[in-house]
Amino acid sequence: MVNIQIRELEEKDLFNGFLESLDSLRKASDLSPKKAKEVFKKIKSDKNYKIYVAVIDSKVVGTTTLFIEQKFIHDGGKVGHIEDVAVRKEYQDKGIGKEVVKALLGYAKKEGCYKTILDCTDDLIQFYEKIGFKKVFSYP
């Protein structure tokens, strides 16, 4: 595997591969710099959000978001929600998505989440099962 660094998203990453990485899910790189910085600051100020990036040669090539939800059940426990797992097309199938997800799962555990969940399309179920997720429900 290539040498990757997994770390928290920084403002300088927005136009250094981060938004382009999200393009593998849905077009994000056309977001204006002003709007991108506004969204970054809003998310960064919310302690329940964490965005990790995968960096190779100083360029962001992948990303994943974790949202932590406080619950009344489970004695006021927390649930982690994985969102926006994205890797730039030319870096896919190199284990990068897996590493970023695993890093956020570790963070969720450290934050006391009693479980971490995600939604995905059927073609991605096998990818997440390899990481340790279990399929619970599928829409008809």
Predicted regions and their residues:
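Conserved acetyl-CoA-binding loop-helix of GNAT-fold acetyltransferases
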Residues: 87, 93-106
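Conserved catalytic-core motifs of GNAT/GCN5-like acyltransferases
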Residues: 68-71, 117-119, 123, 129, ...
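A short helix-loop-beta-strand connector motif used in the catalytic cores of GNAT acetyltransferases and
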Residues: 41-53, 81
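A conserved beta-turn-beta hairpin within the catalytic core of GNAT-like acetyltransferases
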Residues: 70-82, 92
